[in-house]
Swiss-Prot record:
The keyword Zinc-finger applies. Keywords: Chaperone, Cytoplasm, DNA replication, Metal-binding, Repeat, Stress response, Zinc, Zinc-finger. GO terms for molecular function: ATP binding; heat shock protein binding; unfolded protein binding; zinc ion binding. This is Chaperone protein DnaJ. It comes from Photobacterium profundum (strain SS9). Its cofactor is Zn(2+). Zn(2+) 1 binds at residues 148, 151, 201, 204.
Amino acid sequence: MSKRDFYEVLGVGRDAGERDIKKAYKRLAMKFHPDRNQEADATEKFKEVKTAYEILTDPQKKAAYDQYGHAAFEQGSGGGGYGGGGGADFGDIFGDVFGDIFGGAGGGRRQQQRAQRGSDLRYNMELTLEEAVRGCSKEIRVPTLVGCDSCDGSGAKRGSSATTCGTCHGQGQVQMRQGFFAVQQACPHCHGRGKIIKDPCNSCHGQGRVEKTKTLSVKIPAGVDTGDRIRLSGEGEAGEFGAPAGDLYVQVHVAEHSIFERDGNNLYCEVPVSFTMAAVGGEVEVPTLNGRVNLKVPSETQTGRMFRMRGKGVKSVRGGAVGDLICKLVVETPVNLSSHQKELLKELEESFGGKAAGKHKPKSEGFFNGVKKFFDDLTG
């Protein structure tokens, strides 16, 4: 019986790359694996898929196959045959297919277990707006794991040392077989460390690390804002058995301010003015983060008008120009008026009457003219 083309076996084109070949192989190997497929021809198809994969993922064998076809691997042709006498090691195949899950890129082979780097930590820091804009130094206390001083982080009592695990021979992993299946898992004897501590340190009980609250000084750069993160390298948890420590990330949150709101590099505030000043003009004192300044209020200023004070905002921690302070004027209505004051206001209002009223209250005139037109249209 003639042999099928290897590209046809895997269902890929002749221009397929190694990634596509491997993807097709995994899919077909799972489909025809004898432990999953009880059909009579499943084993033969499985062997065929395995052989095609081995040839097409070996650069030299693939080049020979592309030039000579199956003849390149027939006995006596100098190609050396397909290897393995046409048999298939289902345990190895399982490792190839699931190696990235159980054994990493090593295709299910044992890998040296290393002491793990320490975990990163996060500290939430609240700053006032002034602290965030100007920068400051803060002292913080962080509960963490540090290397044990008694054993220098080894976990073993002074004068002793850890020995190689006899179960995994220092690899940290063992292979468990169930029928055709081969699965790698952490060594149950040394818990994946590859070493056994027979005489543990009394201070850390063989862990190499102890709990401690560290006091750290954190320098906050000027211009930080909510959401910014400051990294303190090596100030996280100590690593296992002398491995590098993790990092500490200080997460910044800027508290609300009683006067200012921040948006990027700009600051916003509301400035109340009397209706008299809004009408006739004047000056009002405005606070900034660098002191007080006077803002000129033009006559006939309406409530909600914005005034920009350039360079009175924030300089970003990332550099660039300083932002602006944007002041929104709010005209206050007087309250707690005496009878005399109310009479004076009524006289002022009456002085706006007559045909010239519109020029004193342009928005009111426009509004009421619009209302009149609206009802005229409804009834017309």
